[in-house]
Amino acid sequence: MSWMRKALLSVFHYPVKLLVKAHSIPVNVETELGIDKSKPIVYLLPTNSVTDQLSLRMSTQALDLPSPTKTLTLAGREYSSTLFLRKTQPLFRSSAKDTGIEEVFTDLFHLHRDHENLDLQVVPVYVTWGRAPGRGNPGLSDLIADKAAPSWLRKLFIVLFLGRDNFINYSKAVSARAMSNQHGSDQSIAHKLVRVASTHFQRKRQSMTGPTLLERQELNNSVLGSDAVRRAIAEESRSKKVSHDKAKACAQSYITEIAADYREGLIRFGDRLLTRIWNKIYNGISVGHAERIRELAANGHEIIYVPCHRSHMDYLLLTYVIYHEGMVTPHIAAGINLNFWPVGKMFRRGGAFFLRRSFAGNKLYTAVFREYLELLFNKGYSVKYYPEGGRSRTGRLIPPKTGMLAITIQAMLKGVNRPVSIVPVYIGYENVMEVKSYLNELKGSKKKKESNLQVFSAIRKLKNYGHGYVNFGEPIALNQFLESHVPNWRDCKDAEPEKKPAWLTPAVNELANNVMTRINRAAALNGMALTSLCLLSSKTQTMSEAELKQSIGDFMDLFKAVPFSDDATIPDSTAEALLRDTLKLGRFDIKEDDYGRLISPQPKSAVYLTYYRNNILHLFAIPGLVMASVFAKKGTTKNDILQLIAALYPLLQKELFLHLTQDEALAHTDALVTALLNNGLLRQKDKELLPPDAHCKQFHSAWLLSRCMQETLQRYAVVLTILDKEKVISRGALERESKQVAERLSALYGLSSPEFYDKNVLSSFIGALKENHWLDSEKDGSLKYSEECEALRQDVMALIWPEMMQHLENVALNGQTN
């Protein structure tokens, strides 16, 4: 390193330390990127910049990596720890020169040829200031926007104004030893490395800032000038007998209603504001598997985020997480109900585009919306939409609305230049601000329209909301999905877009189910959900602190022994710490006596806990059935358990969006039985599986596990009993009568869960019965009870509470519910 460079690093050290806040992406570089701190490291940056090097030094200090400003000694020779592709752009010249880095790499490869024990890691690092994507017509604000190789004067203003938005993005380490062994050590290999690095940095910039922003005129011309929209305008003019100009003006108004107006400045302001809010209301945000989206972006994929929808907070939380994981914030599909002043304008500038709840019958609106979405895909913008169509009121996933997925596939048919990947996202909370209004809606109250009053009321009520959880599920490569399900899908590219191919609906339905199962596969266990599940499974909804702590610990140990999936996450903390943090959320009554503390839901708030329990109920479906069988029969065999799972799993799979196939579910059950035995939640006598002894400390946990699926089984029993009573019944009548009986049982037995008699949940189960051929169909569409269905009813009735079983038997025999 020259004396001039050392002097500049010393001079700018304190100004940079004062002005710059370096954000490292990712934080866990060893695990995610394979960087070995014990081996020598050289950092490769795109531009020779003192401030970039100093901000990188701040980041490496935080990550305990070698300093980029120190000299690196290799085989007795000294090298700079930081290499650059290009020099800084001169003040009065339009382009930056290369640094002659090829010669340095050639020398390093020769060094590896001569020293077999040497293994240098080349770590590409992209340093960006701000995340401005650039515009077709630059304005004054673009003078301080970061660019590939700014002059020293421009860099001065960039650091002054964007120093707090500095991002250090590390890439996977490249082994110089591996390259030297595989490709040799001549100059052509160094040239190839430099060329690949240059392309890599371009993609990295694209993934962090996104493509150049569309100007409004360009947007209008692209949408209105498309063949589909022009045909729709002509059809609108002809069918409604209005002038062509009026129909075109209507299409223009739809664009204005729909389109986002992305402003990077608002994103930066929102980042600062949300950081303050999150620090106030959350104890932390846990993010899982973010490396997946970074890898997709690095490979040039168009990314479509499809998260579950728990709360209006989802819009902000997921965008915030994506931004802090080093990705460009997506354009977000939002319901038109959120387009009210001033929130609508803020959302629009944050990347939201608005859609109506239904497009039915409005061909012009449909054409404009489709063309706008296709334009986003083709220009390279990432997109986010909610497959459920609305927020879940019960805490469980809602059957998906397939409209947006269908439009996405139709866009593929018209030709999207890049590979498209759909990324399912699980979002979980320990406290949802809307949960009270959700339960009121389930009880029949009318949904309140979103308004400023609601926003201010929500802000006023901000408090300790515990942890937030965002897990990125396994991506679905849409091209590969279509190849496997519809091998000839490319033949439809030239077909008229208004005509749907016959394969579209079944393919979209399969894709939608795939999305939902991958969301649930990436579930996050948390303290609130586990505590809620335990208390609601107990007979009196009250437990001692010691019992609760033991049960939470036992359940966490069970999922560590037999994970629900590779994508599901378990808290790192102990059961004691998890319970302590959960009790601070203020959802529980805590009473203390001479024997310790008793914990129960706050008065009349047990129903709220069902929401959080339902977030993770699908994880407990199979272990819950296993233990329900063991306790109900006071002992059973593994073969009997496997037969029970084989019968019930297809129904649970449909309702709870479980990812395992039938064979995988049986293998999972087998592994669970072994883990339950090893963990003391089961005991074995000869071939018989029995509950733990009553004096065993795991007994209470096993008992709770046996009760956690009771409401689901009881709901099944209600539907099957009415089918048994009627023998032949229309689907509508079955849903109505099932709802009436379930409501009555809920009142009689004090069931806290509103979804016990929710029409949508009952309908989903009836649909699963039909799909799995438990029911026969009459010519008029009525459902006919079958012998197979009777066998299923007997299995289910044997698992529910005896008093509930007796009540339902009276219904079957006499048609009485009292």
Swiss-Prot record:
Where is it mainly found?
membrane
**Motif HXXXXD motif positions after renumbering to this chain:** 308-313
Localization:
Cell inner membrane
Q: Which reaction does it catalyse?
A: sn-glycerol 3-phosphate + an acyl-CoA = a 1-acyl-sn-glycero-3-phosphate + CoA
Q: Which NCBIfam families does the UniProt record give? A: plsB, PRK04974.1
Which organism does this sequence originate in? Answer: Alteromonas mediterranea (strain DSM 17117 / CIP 110805 / LMG 28347 / Deep ecotype)
Family that this chain belongs to? Belongs to the GPAT/DAPAT family.
Q: What is this protein called?
A: Glycerol-3-phosphate acyltransferase
GO CC terms: plasma membrane
Q: What is its EC number?
A: 2.3.1.15
**HAMAP family the record matches:** Glyc3P_acyltrans
Which GO biological process categories is it annotated with?
CDP-diacylglycerol biosynthetic process; fatty acid metabolic process
Keywords (alphabetical) are:
Acyltransferase, Cell inner membrane, Cell membrane, Lipid biosynthesis, Lipid metabolism, Membrane, Phospholipid biosynthesis, Phospholipid metabolism, Transferase
The membrane-topology field of this record reads: Peripheral membrane protein
UniProt key word Membrane: yes
Q: What is known of its domains?
A: The HXXXXD motif is essential for acyltransferase activity and may constitute the binding site for the phosphate moiety of the glycerol-3-phosphate.
Q: Extract the coiled-coil ranges from the record.
A: none
What pathway is this protein a component of?
Phospholipid metabolism; CDP-diacylglycerol biosynthesis; CDP-diacylglycerol from sn-glycerol 3-phosphate: step 1/3
* Keyword Membrane in annotation: yes
Q: Name one GO molecular function term.
A: glycerol-3-phosphate O-acyltransferase activity
Query: Which Pfam families has this protein been placed in?
Result: Acyltransferase, GPAT_C
